[in-house]
Amino acid sequence: MLGMPIYRYGDSSVFEQIIELPIPGINRNEVLVKIKSTSVNPIDLMKREGYGKTIFEKQRKQLFPWILGSDISGVVKEVGSKVTKFKEGDEVYGSSSNPNSGTYCEYAAFNQNEIDFKPNNLSFNEAASLNDKFLGLKSISFWLKAVYSQ
């Protein structure tokens, strides 16, 4: 697959080239999505400049190259053995919390809880831009799940 990594922190000039990368594998709770559209979230710009690097560097398997991006819309290409909600061909949108699976590329792996069905009345571009708008709602949802699952 093609992707656009960064090799160091900095301004937009750190996006130097598009390169060939391996398509990510998925685990039993994940979905592989062929990305149709991705959006640039403000946190992506901050991460590119080094914001939160102490935390993010501890979470990443390798420091660089790093594929940024988290918000997407696309089409399901593969589902893990424990995924029941989605099937190949489903149109989805979502936001990844995985620091090792960015979205400035052609494919990304998502936990099944990080994506949902793309609304039929939205284009792929429109759906990819929704995720930042719902960040507050997602935070509340994750908090409620954590509180009530105990």
Could you say what each language-model-derived stretch is?
Residues 61-62, 95-150:
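NAD(P)H dinucleotide-binding glycine-rich loop of Rossmann-like/cofactor-binding domains
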Residues 21-73:
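N-terminal glycine-rich beta->alpha transition that marks the start or flank
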Residues 10-16, 42-43:
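Short N-terminal binding/cap micro-motifs at the start of the first secondary-structure element
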Residues 1-4:
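Short structural boundary motif marking the start of a folded domain
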Residues 6, 26, 38, 79, ...:
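Residue-level recognition of beta-strand microenvironments
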Residues 73-97:
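A glycine-/small-residue-rich N-terminal strand-loop-strand element
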